[in-house]
Design a protein with these regions (language model features):
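Universal eukaryotic N-terminal targeting presequences
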Residues: 15-17, 282
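Short, Lys/Arg-enriched N-terminal segments with co-localized hydrophobic residues
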Residues: 1-15
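C-terminal segment of classical bacterial N-terminal signal peptides
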Residues: 29-35
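Short S/T/G/P-rich N-terminal loop/turn motif that feeds into the first structured element of a domain
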Residues: 36-134, 138-282
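Sec-dependent N-terminal signal peptides
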Residues: 19-29
Length: 282
């Protein structure tokens, strides 16, 4: 999001562990991209307004952490008994040395909390999976017990500004946001409508998509996170400049609705996508 930034908002205390920075970079394929034969209209229908249950898991790189070992581990992980209810999984790597967090993240996407909880219950009882994770602790460890969950929704066609770059790379900004006094998700939806109208007027062809990670009201530091997905960091900078210059009514509405902290920025990529052979179960 091209949004007004005021102050600084942090994640919850349990996510402030100082752990080794992940440095891998996976290829990114949008979660709902089904195949080259599927039309953009199909993708749009599948994505817009669909509420998903997404989880973020903090991960630590070990002494044997390198690209070759990570690739091997990911291939092995996709060969395990992964739940059919898992819609997708992504890796996030801090893009700057000034990130609040030294750790990387896995994001898992599900249709519901019930589906996620059922899959986790089966996963921790899977002896083959537990043995695999133990064997790869020197490469990477992800702490499932520390996962955080959010209701995620796309509010615009992810391809409205064109396709991803050919190599699949993209750049992510996560803005932690707190509703201003008297404001709520209803006000945010009105602001989003104005934001989409503003986006419609842009003369831009660089890939850009965004989504909202809504909290359950129990986090004192962030009511929701706004996720920006750009083609690259240059695209993010250009978008921010355009927003500050021409945001107008949409910008005023968003700033009146919520105050958002300095974003966390990441190089990101797919770990699992059941619709893409290279990243599906093997």
């Amino acid at each position: 999001m091209y949004i007004f930034i005021k102050g600084e908002v942090l994640f919850g205390e349990k996510y402030m562990k100082k752990i080794i920075t992940l440095s891998f970079c996976f290829m990114f394929i949008v979660l709902f991209e089904q195949s080259e034969a599927q039309s953009t209209d199909d993708v749009t229908f599948d994505v817009i307004g669909v509420q998903l249950y997404n989880e973020f898991i903090p991960c630590v790189g070990g002494p044997d952490f390198n690209q070759e070992n990570v690739d091997k581990m990911m291939k092995g992980w996709r060969a395990l008994n992964i739940s059919d209810d898992l819609l997708g999984a992504w890796g996030y790597v801090p893009a700057t040395d000034t990130s609040r967090f030294d750790n990387g993240w896995w994001e898992l996407s599900w249709e519901s909390k019930e589906a996620a909880d059922a899959a986790w219950a089966q996963w921790v009882q899977d002896e083959e999976a537990m043995a695999f994770l133990a064997e790869n602790e020197s490469v990477m460890v992800c702490n499932g017990e520390e996962r955080a969950s959010w209701d995620f929704t796309f509010h615009r066609d992810v391809y409205s500004f064109g396709p991803m770059s050919e190599d699949g790379s993209f750049f992510t900004e996560f803005f932690p946001c707190k509703y201003n006094a008297g404001k709520s998700s209803d006000d945010l939806m009105k602001s989003i409508a104005l934001y989409n109208k503003w986006l419609d007027g842009l003369d831009a062809t660089s890939f850009y998509a965004y989504g909202i990670y809504a909290g359950d009201g129990t986090d004192e530091l962030a009511d929701f996170w706004w996720g920006n997905f750009h083609e690259n960091s240059d695209g993010a900078a250009a978008g921010q400049a355009s927003w500050l210059e021409t945001g107008g009514e949409a910008r005023a509405s968003l700033e009146a609705t919520a105050t958002c902290g300095v974003p966390e920025v990441y190089n990101s990529g797919v770990i699992y996508d059941p619709s893409v052979p290279e990243f599906s179960k093997s």
